[in-house]
Design a protein with these regions (language model features):
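Glycine- and other small-residue-rich loops at beta-strand/loop junctions that grip anionic moieties
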Residues: 6-7, 117-120, 175-178
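Gly/Ser-rich oxyanion-binding loop with an adjacent helix/lid
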Residues: 101-153
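Alpha-helical support elements that line or immediately flank enzyme active sites
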Residues: 15-27, 84, 126-136
Length: 251
């Protein structure tokens, strides 16, 4: 069973995860074709970070022109329009992320922009799923990490969203460094938050960068693509898949 593990060391955005998947082998021209096929008008920038101490890719979706509050209903309508032409089956996959995202909103509020979420984040999610589909990823897992509280509204949201993050013996990741939409992707799409063990055979390792040119301190998301060998007792039989769900799992 092919799986992707995500390890977060610090700063994390959805675009950084896409950058890591490009570094893993997803061609940027493929992502451009995905946008074209879906009738999506969106521009992005991608480049290898030549100054990084390790191979890392930078990726960034340019902001869409959108003014005023960003309500969940508008965000979901944008998501539906992205999926309907080529991948209508991904609409439900997005709902998993949006449910997690909603848990980070202040009580009685429905404006996603309060948490730093913007309309182009929907395009980031679509391209992330395109990357996972290209790599034939069947399930996504997140390696547990502890989170340090922050003071901003976005930090409060990320902490509220990541209910499953758990804890490790490593340094805690500041909630200020985790974008709420990236937090919702991990919480909504991860089959589980577990450590890699002997069942997982890593085939590729890649990094996403939050900078196109800084040499250190920016390659804080590591992605591992590989296979589970113990299929009889595999977690895959018991947990949500990226593109679908266990029929016994209540969403």
């Amino acid at each position: 069973m092919k799986a992707l593990f995500v390890r977060c060391y610090g700063r994390l955005t959805a675009d950084m995860m896409i950058g890591g998947l490009i570094d893993m082998g997803v061609p940027p021209v493929y992502l451009k074709s995905c946008l074209s096929d879906a009738g999506i008008t969106a521009d992005f920038m991608e480049k290898l970070n030549p100054a990084a101490q390790i191979s890392a890719h930078y990726f960034h979706i340019f902001p869409e022109a959108f003014e005023g509050p960003l309500y969940m209903v508008s965000f979901m309508a944008r998501w539906r329009s992205l999926c309907e032409k080529v991948h209508p089956e991904w609409e439900e996959t997005g709902w998993k992320v949006f449910r997690a995202l909603a848990s980070g909103l202040p009580e009685g509020k429905d404006d996603l922009s309060l948490n730093g979420v913007s309309m182009e984040n929907a395009v980031s999610l679509y391209l992330l799923l395109c990357c996972l589909d290209y790599l034939e990823t069947e399930s996504l897992f997140t390696i547990p990490f502890s989170i340090e509280k922050g003071t901003s509204e976005a930090a409060r949201a990320s902490l509220a969203i990541l209910k499953s993050a758990g804890a490790t013996d490593g340094e805690p990741v500041p909630a200020e460094d985790i974008h709420p939409f990236a937090a919702a992707i991990l919480e909504g799409l991860s089959a589980d938050f577990i450590s890699m063990d002997g069942r997982f055979l890593s085939d590729k390792t890649a990094y996403g960068s939050s900078s196109a040119d800084k040499p250190t301190g920016d390659n804080t998301v590591c992605l591992y693509l590989g296979y589970y060998t113990d299929r009889a007792e595999s977690v895959f039989g018991r947990h949500m898949k990226v593109f679908g769900a266990n029929p016994d799992l209540e969403l």
